[in-house]
C-alpha cells in the first residue's frame, strides 16, 4: 500500500519523506547521460577528424614551443636564483619590518592605553581640583577656627589659672581656719582631759572617803542600832547594884542612913543610871543626826559625782564630736579643693587635647594638600608626555586654580575623596612591611 502510494505520480509530496535511493536514481541517470555524450563526441572526432596531419603539426609546434619553453626555463632559473636571493633578503627585511611593526603596534597600544589612562586621570584630576579647592577653603577655615580656639583656650587657661589661684588661697585660708580650730580643739581636749583627770582623782578621793565614812557608819550603826533604853537602864541598875558603892551604902550603919547627906547621896546614886541613860540617848540621837547628815552628804557627793561624770562624758562626747566635725569639714574642704583642681586640670587637658587635635588635623590636611599637588603635577607632566608621544594637538587642561564659579561640593563626595586619598597614602606604608615578612 505504501509502495503504490510512493510510485504514484499523483501522490502528495508532503505526505512522506523521500529516501536516499530516490535521489540516487536521478544521479545515476544523469551520469549515464554524460558518459553517453562523451563517447559520442569521441566517435565523431575519430570519424570526421585528420589525425596524422594534426599530430605532425602539433609535434612541430610542440618542439618549437619546447625549445622556447626551455630557453624560458633557463632564463627563469637564473631569475629564480636571483629572485630567491632577493626573496631571502626580502624575508629577512620582512621579518625585521614585521617585528618593528609588532613593536610599533605594541608601543602604539601602550601609548593609546596610557593616553586613555591619562585622559581618565586628567578628567579625574580636573574633578579633583574642586575637592582641592574645597580642602584649601576648609584649611583656611580650620586655621581661623584654630586661632579662635587658641584665643579661647588661652582665655580659659587664664581664667582657670585665676580660679586655681583663688582656690589655692581659699584652701590656704581654710587650712589656717582648720589649723586654728584644730589647735582650739586640742586645747579644749587637753583642758577636758585635765578636768577629767581631776574629776577622776576627786572621784577616787571621794570613793575612799565614802568607803571610810561607810565603814564608820556601819560601825556606829552596829553600835547604835542594838541600843535598847529599858534594857540599858536595867543593865545600868544591875551594874549599880553590883557595884561597890551600892554595897557600901547598903552596909553602912543605920545612924549613917539617918543623915540627910546620905539620903541625897543615895538619891543621886540611884538617879545616876537614868542620867546615864538620858545622856547616852542624847548621844545616840546626836550620832543618828550625824549619821543622817553624813548619809545626806554622801548622797550629795554621789549626785555631784554623777553630775561630774555626766559633765565629763558630755565634754568628751563634745570633744569627739567637734573633732569629727572638724575632720569631716577638713576632709570635705580637701575633697572640694581636689575636685575643683581636678576639674580645672581636666578642662585644661581637654582644651589642650582639642588644640592638639586641631593642629594635627591642620598638619594632616596640609600634608594631604601637598601630596595632592605633587600627584597632580606628576600626572600633568605624564599627560603632557603622552600628548607629545601621540603627536596630537591636545591642549593640556588648566589646573592652576578652580573655575570662577565652581559647583557646590557634596560633603559625601568630599569625604569619599579624603578616604581614597588616605587609603592611597596608607598602602605604600603597609606593602614594604609585608615584603620582608614573606
From Swiss-Prot:
Signal peptide (residue range): none
Chain's gene name: Plvap
Keywords linked to the UniProt accession: Cell membrane, Coiled coil, Cytoplasm, Glycoprotein, Membrane, Signal-anchor, Transmembrane, Transmembrane helix
Residue span of region Disordered: 391-413
The protein's name: Plasmalemma vesicle-associated protein
Transmembrane stretches, start-end: 27-47
InterPro entries (UniProt xref): PV-1
Membrane protein topology class: Single-pass type II membrane protein
Primary site of residence: membrane
Record topology, Cytoplasmic segments: 1-26
Residue ranges, compositional bias (Pro residues): 394-410
Coiled-coil segments: 140-160, 189-224, 281-383
Organism of origin: Mus musculus
Pfam family, one: PV-1
Role noted for this protein: Endothelial cell-specific membrane protein involved in the formation of the diaphragms that bridge endothelial fenestrae. It is also required for the formation of stomata of caveolae and transendothelial channels. Functions in microvascular permeability, endothelial fenestrae contributing to the passage of water and solutes and regulating transcellular versus paracellular flow in different organs. Plays a specific role in embryonic development.
Amino acid at each position: 500500500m505504501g509502495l503504490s502510494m510512493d510510485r504514484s505520480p499523483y501522490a502528495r509530496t508532503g505526505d512522506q519523506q523521500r529516501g536516499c535511493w530516490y535521489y540516487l536514481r536521478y544521479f545515476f541517470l544523469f551520469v549515464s547521460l554524460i558518459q553517453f555524450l562523451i563517447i559520442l563526441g569521441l566517435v565523431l572526432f575519430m570519424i570526421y577528424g585528420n589525425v596524422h596531419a594534426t599530430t605532425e603539426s602539433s609535434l612541430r609546434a610542440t618542439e618549437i614551443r619546447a625549445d622556447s619553453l626551455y630557453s624560458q626555463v633557463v632564463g627563469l632559473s637564473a631569475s629564480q636564483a636571483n629572485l630567491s636571493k632577493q626573496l631571502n633578503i626580502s624575508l629577512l627585511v620582512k621579518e625585521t619590518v614585521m617585528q618593528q611593526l609588532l613593536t610599533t603596534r605594541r608601543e602604539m597600544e601602550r601609548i593609546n592605553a596610557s593616553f586613555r589612562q591619562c585622559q581618565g586621570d586628567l578628567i579625574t584630576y580636573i574633578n579633583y581640583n574642586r575637592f582641592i579647592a574645597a580642602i584649601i577653603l576648609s584649611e583656611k577655615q580650620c586655621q581661623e577656627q584654630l586661632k579662635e580656639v587658641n584665643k579661647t583656650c588661652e582665655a580659659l587657661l587664664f581664667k582657670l589659672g585665676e580660679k586655681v589661684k583663688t582656690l589655692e588661697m581659699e584652701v590656704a585660708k581654710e587650712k589656717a581656719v582648720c589649723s586654728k580650730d584644730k589647735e582650739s580643739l586640742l586645747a579644749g581636749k587637753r583642758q577636758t582631759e585635765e578636768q577629767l583627770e581631776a574629776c577622776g582623782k576627786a572621784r577616787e578621793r571621794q570613793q575612799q572617803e565614802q568607803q571610810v565614812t561607810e565603814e564608820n557608819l556601819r560601825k556606829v550603826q552596829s553600835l547604835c542600832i542594838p541600843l535598847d533604853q529599858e534594857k540599858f537602864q536595867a543593865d545600868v541598875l544591875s551594874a549599880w547594884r553590883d557595884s561597890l558603892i551600892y554595897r557600901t551604902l547598903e552596909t553602912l550603919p543605920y545612924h549613917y542612913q539617918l543623915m540627910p547627906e546620905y539620903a541625897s547621896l543615895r538619891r543621886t546614886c540611884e538617879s545616876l543610871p537614868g542620867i546615864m541613860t538620858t545622856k547616852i540617848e542624847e548621844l545616840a540621837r546626836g550620832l543618828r543626826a550625824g549619821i543622817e547628815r553624813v548619809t545626806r552628804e554622801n548622797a550629795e557627793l554621789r549626785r555631784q559625782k554623777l553630775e561630774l561624770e555626766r559633765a565629763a562624758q558630755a565634754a568628751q562626747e563634745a570633744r569627739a564630736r567637734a573633732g569629727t566635725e572638724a575632720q569631716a569639714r577638713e576632709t570635705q574642704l580637701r575633697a572640694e579643693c581636689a575636685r575643683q583642681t581636678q576639674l580645672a586640670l581636666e578642662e585644661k587637658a581637654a582644651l589642650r587635647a582639642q588644640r592638639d587635635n586641631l593642629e594635627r588635623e591642620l598638619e594632616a590636611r596640609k600634608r594631604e594638600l601637598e601630596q595632592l599637588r605633587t600627584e597632580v603635577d606628576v600626572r600633568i607632566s605624564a599627560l603632557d608626555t603622552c600628548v607629545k608621544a601621540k603627536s596630537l594637538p591636545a591642549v593640556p587642561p588648566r589646573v592652576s586654580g578652580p573655575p570662577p564659579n565652581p559647583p557646590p561640593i557634596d560633603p559625601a563626595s568630599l569625604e569619599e575623596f579624603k578616604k581614597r586619598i588616605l587609603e592611597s597614602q596608607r598602602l605604600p606604608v603597609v606593602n614594604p612591611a609585608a615584603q620582608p615578612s614573606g
